[in-house]
A protein has these predicted regions:
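Membrane-proximal, solvent-exposed terminal domains/tails of membrane-associated proteins
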Residues: 248, 253-258, 377, 382
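Segments forming glycine/polar-rich beta-alpha architectures that bind adenosine-containing cofactors
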Residues: 161, 246-249
Length: 530
């Protein structure tokens, strides 16, 4: 029912906007209506249904948020800006409430003015049952004034909302009403599924990185940039994603890193980048050039401020995670994400262009992501969190050589042994020992893959990891029982490069992927079981 309630509130925005247009005229003339459709019964029925349904829906959503807004990691609203959500909810309640009351008042006014036919259920199917009795014997002039006042209140609430939202470019809970259409339309898949899918290619000099492009770059004297180190290097879809975040916390609720106490929340990761982007946006810089300078905050003043999320639920995340008491970025960005070095502002946002990793997003948070994709799968506005994490990792690995030492060991093992554990290739067939049938190997038992129905790609885990070996054996047995001929590459198989790509080493991934493509072409593989 929550999805239905949210859908009703969403639909109320474009439909009830026309009642806002009507309200401007109703201040002066209570019987004014939109040309052509204003007194068209189906339109009036739609307005009344949407107004009443969205009123019930928003009240229900407020109750859900209030119940789920617990303190600590258990709440998906931890870190969300509470006052912004309450402001948006209050505005919706006020506007749709005014529409409800206006329909009652209009029905009462028509009844008082002896326009019984216009006040009938044909035009007021829901609110007329309350309005018509109220209009009996009432003064039409008084009811006309009531209509004017309600219309004015509706206009003031709506315009106040537009002004405040316009002044708060980082108010995602409001801006998603405009940007969600863009982020959903521009997602990776056009078949209606979520944005979860293959990682975006790394763009270098306007081209997707490939082995051929790497060869060109080696011959060139230019120094290309890999990945993203500053906010302006993100493409427009990424920036739209940041501003479209609704702060609903569904990504945070299912994040394994967050739920196991790691210093990462996909929601707060997005909000950190959003707030930094808003703080260093070109229009802010233009205002500074005109003499509008942000407030200067000294280290002493900053140290005297309470360390918590400020307006975001009052939770001291730094304290709860055992971090330093006086971290610079604590109000708009989760303190656990940050080891602040850039110039902080009163709100805790880095207000000057700065490297993102270490100054907007903490290194521990960046490497805590498992790239499982639960955040992307759950996001209602199709924000692509994983791609943004990998963008930052690519820069750290390929430009800064800044990554956990365990990854360095894995990279070397992938390069030398073709698997993340550094095990010898000759052990890739150990999973087949003990089977009641022989597993043919391409180049040994069969000349090439064209002699069998399928090439069975075992993979590193399926070949080396004890639990995965059971799955590999089961698949092979099923193929054998079904009478499907298959073969494997044995020690000719190498890692797909997926671990390297998830870790940000796109160059190593492209190298391994190209090797595998070459191998598959050589053996003539047409149909592959993975």
């Amino acid at each position: 029912w929550i999805r239905l309630a949210h859908w009703l509130v969403m639909v109320s925005f474009p439909i009830l906007f026309f009642t806002l247009v009507t309200g401007y005229a109703q201040i002066f003339s209570p019987d004014w209506a939109l040309p052509l459709i204003g007194h068209f019964p189906p339109w009036e029925w739609l307005v009344e249904f949407i107004a009443l349904a969205s009123t019930i829906a928003i009240i229900g959503l407020i109750v859900v948020r209030s119940v789920n807004t617990a303190h600590g990691r258990k709440s998906r609203f931890t870190g969300s800006t509470r006052w912004q959500a309450r402001f948006v909810e209050a505005t919706i309640v006020a506007v749709v409430g005014c529409v409800d009351l206006l329909r009652v008042a209009e029905s009462a006014w028509l009844s008082a003015a002896q326009h019984e036919q216009s006040a009938s259920w044909v035009h007021f199917p829901i609110f007329g049952w309350l309005g018509r009795p109220l209009g009996q014997g009432a003064n039409p002039d008084t009811l006309a004034n009531v209509i004017a006042v309600l219309a004015l209140v509706k206009i003031l609430c709506s315009m106040t909302w537009f002004v405040i939202v316009g002044l708060q470019p980082s108010m995602g809970v409001a801006w998603h009403r405009f940007l969600a259409f863009i982020t959903i339309y521009a997602r990776k898949h056009d078949d209606g599924t979520s944005a979860l899918g293959p990682l975006e290619p790394m763009i270098v000099d306007g081209k997707p990185l490939t082995v051929d492009l790497l060869d060109e770059l080696e011959e060139s004297d230019a120094e290309p940039n890999f990945g993203v180190s500053r906010i302006e290097q993100f493409h427009w879809k990424a920036l739209a994603d940041f501003s479209a975040c609704t702060e609903c916390g569904r990504c945070q609720d299912l994040c394994p890193a967050w739920n196991t106490g790691k210093p990462l929340s996909p929601k707060l990761f997005t909000l950190a980048l959003r707030d930094h982007h808003a703080a260093v946006a070109p229009f802010i810089a233009a205002a500074q050039q005109l003499g509008v300078e942000p407030e200067e905050v000294s280290d002493e003043q900053l140290a005297q401020r309470p360390v918590h999320l400020g307006v975001r639920d009052g939770l001291s995340v730094n304290t709860s995670l055992g971090l330093a008491e006086n971290s610079a970025h604590t109000q708009d960005i989760l303190g656990a994400l940050l080891e602040a070095k850039a110039a902080p502002s009163e709100t805790g946002v880095a207000t000057k262009p700065a490297p993102l990793v270490g100054e907007v997003i903490g290194e521990a948070a960046l490497w805590a992501c498992t790239t499982c994709g639960a955040c992307v799968d759950q996001c209602p506005v199709d924000i692509e969190h994983i791609d943004r994490v990998i963008d930052l990792r690519r820069n750290q690995v390929l430009m800064e050589s800044a990554f956990p030492k365990e990854l360095g060991q894995m990279f070397r093992k992938l390069e030398s042994k073709g698997n993340p554990w550094g095990l010898p290739p000759r052990k890739r067939l150990e999973w087949a020992k003990g089977l009641e049938f022989d597993v043919p190997v391409v180049g040994v038992d069969v000349e090439d893959a064209s002699e069998v129905d399928y090439l069975f790609w075992v993979g590193c885990a399926g070949a080396y990891e004890d639990r995965a070996k059971k799955t590999t054996r089961a698949v092979a047995e099923l193929l054998h029982i079904a009478g499907v001929s298959f073969a494997v590459l044995g020690d000719g198989e190498s890692c797909t490069g997926d671990p390297a790509r998830r870790a940000g080493n796109e160059i190593l991934f492209q190298t391994l992927a190209a090797q595998n493509v070459e191998t598959l072409n050589e053996v003539g593989a047409k149909r592959i079981v993975v």
